[in-house]
Amino acid sequence: VPATIRHLYFHIPFCPKLCPYCSFYVEVGGEHKTTAFLDALLAEVDHMRQRFELRPHTIYFGGGTPSALRIEQLDYLLSGLRARLDLSELREWDLEANPATIRQDKAKLLHALGITRLSLGVQSWDDDLLKVLGRVHNAAQAEQTVEILRDAGFTNLNIDLMFAVPGQTPTQWESTIAKTIALRP
């Protein structure tokens, strides 16, 4: 009997921009590589299915910025995985997202395809600190993204925050925590 794999992590290395603090493997842009990458990822899943029973409890898409994939790419990837994996015991399907890459149509598709939790890389609710971090979104856009995700049906959101950003004051951190709690992710 083959071993059963219960937890899967897929690294989607594509990003709209390299943030100065990032130490992960990323490809900025990379549009010309995306299709080949997704084909290779699904081929790897096919290969793994020959050796293991893939019946995950959790699936996590990290990066990079998985939400930077275009709608048709996300549909291809998620539909391809749904066709290849036994999801009967799936408890959580998480995807990391940058607020600048989520619009209503993408949020609705992600929810419809079974993503149960979005991990939103807000990092801060302070525009000055977001500039220090080199983020491509601002605080208002991040807050709007939370609303878009709620409207799409997401009830489980994770909001990533960064502490000890250069120049960050205790007051800014307290404000960030208060804002996050008020949004009830």
What residue ranges belong to the model's regions?
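Conserved non-cysteine loop/helix-boundary elements of the Radical SAM core domain that shape
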Residues: 26-51, 55-185
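Structured core elements
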Residues: 9-11, 119
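N-terminal [4Fe-4S]-dependent radical SAM core
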Residues: 1-9, 52-55
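Generic detection of intrinsically disordered/low-complexity segments and helix-coil linkers/edges
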Residues: 3, 8, 18-19, 31, ...
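Local cysteine-cluster metal-coordination motifs and their immediate loop/turn environment
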Residues: 11-24
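Residue-level signal for beta-strand positions within conserved beta-sheet cores that form or flank
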Residues: 4, 17-20, 89-91, 155
